[in-house]
């Protein structure tokens, strides 16, 4: 890599993110001349930020910008184009290309925890950009059925625009896998499946990583189910980000450093 590089995270809020601690520690230990910066960018200033983001080599994208950023980009990778959701932007001279690493993060987490998707009945809470990515992944990997739990089925139908899925404002049936794609559970607050009585042997997957053990996952485990933490998804995303931006994949240290960074930020 020639010269130094500034990369970062944009979203609102970003105070719960461990990225700044984690990536800067990795850069230091691996001798990479780069700095990671978390930036709280409100929706109404996104256009102005992007216009003046020339100082960034790349940046991760989180809520609420994963979809709204797309019109400002020059190109998308295949998965970002399919899902209409971006969580990494890489600047190549004057052009900005959007990538979807959420897909790879989910694949990493499910492989790490040995969760099979084929022929499973799956329900996903949420209808935003990350939900589109999870739906796409589940369909690509042979899910028997994919339903979406949402507060507003009409809005979800418009936002998702994916054929072959069911949209529900409440659920009263059993599924093999439950996935949280909402912010509920962040910092320990809320559970999108609070009205569901989980059965033994089911699987809960949470995209929230702070805390790594959300109220939803605790209830699933107490019911005799198994759980996949959002931290595993985050680790997969992070490894893919470093691979795309710097051509490195530090598997041996990333998980250890991610856990340390999460513990550090949770202590305040």
From Swiss-Prot:
Annotated pathway: Metabolic intermediate biosynthesis; chorismate biosynthesis; chorismate from D-erythrose 4-phosphate and phosphoenolpyruvate: step 4/7
Keyword terms:
Amino-acid biosynthesis, Aromatic amino acid biosynthesis, NADP, Oxidoreductase
* InterPro entries tied to this protein: Aminoacid_DH-like_N_sf, NAD(P)-bd_dom_sf, Shikimate_DH-bd_N, Shikimate_DH_fam
Task: Tell me the protein family, please.
Answer: Belongs to the shikimate dehydrogenase family.
What does the record give as the active site? 66 (proton acceptor)
Annotated organism of origin? Thermoplasma acidophilum (strain ATCC 25905 / DSM 1728 / JCM 9062 / NBRC 15155 / AMRC-C165)
Enzyme nomenclature, EC number:
1.1.1.25
Tree of life domain: Archaea
State the Pfam families in the record: Shikimate_dh_N (PF08501)
Record's CDD domains? NAD_bind_Shikimate_DH
Q: Write down what this protein is called.
A: Shikimate dehydrogenase (NADP(+))
How does this protein assemble?
A: Homodimer.
Entry binding sites for shikimate = 62, 87, 102, 209
Q: Which molecular function GO terms apply here?
A: NADP binding; shikimate 3-dehydrogenase (NADP+) activity
GO biological process: one example: amino acid biosynthetic process
GO CC: one term? cytosol
**Role this protein plays:** Involved in the biosynthesis of the chorismate, which leads to the biosynthesis of aromatic amino acids. Catalyzes the reversible NADPH linked reduction of 3-dehydroshikimate (DHSA) to yield shikimate (SA).
Q: Which sites bind NADP(+)?
A: 78, 126-130, 207, 230
Catalytic reactions on record: shikimate + NADP(+) = 3-dehydroshikimate + NADPH + H(+)
């Amino acid at each position: 890599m020639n010269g130094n590089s500034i990369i970062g995270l944009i979203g609102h809020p970003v105070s719960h993110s461990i990225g700044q601690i984690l990536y800067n520690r990795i850069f230091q230990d691996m001798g990479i001349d780069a700095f990671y910066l978390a930036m709280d960018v409100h929706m109404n200033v996104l256009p102005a930020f992007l216009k003046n983001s020339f100082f960034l080599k790349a940046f991760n994208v989180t809520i609420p910008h994963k979809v709204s950023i797309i019109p400002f980009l020059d190109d998308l990778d295949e998965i970002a184009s399919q899902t209409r959701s971006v969580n990494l932007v890489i600047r190549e001279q004057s052009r900005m290309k959007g990538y979807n690493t959420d897909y790879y993060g989910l694949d990493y987490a499910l492989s790490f925890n040995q969760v099979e998707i084929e022929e499973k009945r799956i329900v996903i809470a949420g209808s935003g950009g990350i939900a589109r990515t999870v739906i796409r992944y589940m369909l690509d990997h042979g899910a028997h059925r994919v339903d979406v739990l949402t507060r507003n089925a009409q809005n979800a139908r418009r936002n998702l625009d994916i054929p072959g899925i069911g949209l529900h404002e409440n659920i009263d049936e059993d599924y093999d896998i439950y996935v949280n794609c909402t912010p509920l559970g962040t910092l320990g607050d809320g559970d999108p499946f609070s009205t569901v009585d989980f059965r033994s042997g089911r699987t809960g997957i949470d995209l929230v990583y702070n805390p790594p053990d959300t109220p939803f996952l605790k209830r699933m485990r107490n019911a005799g189910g198994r759980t996949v933490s959002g931290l595993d998804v985050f680790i997969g995303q992070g490894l893919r980000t470093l691979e795309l931006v710097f051509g490195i994949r530090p598997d041996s240290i990333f998980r250890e450093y991610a856990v340390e960074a999460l513990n550090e930020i949770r202590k305040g």
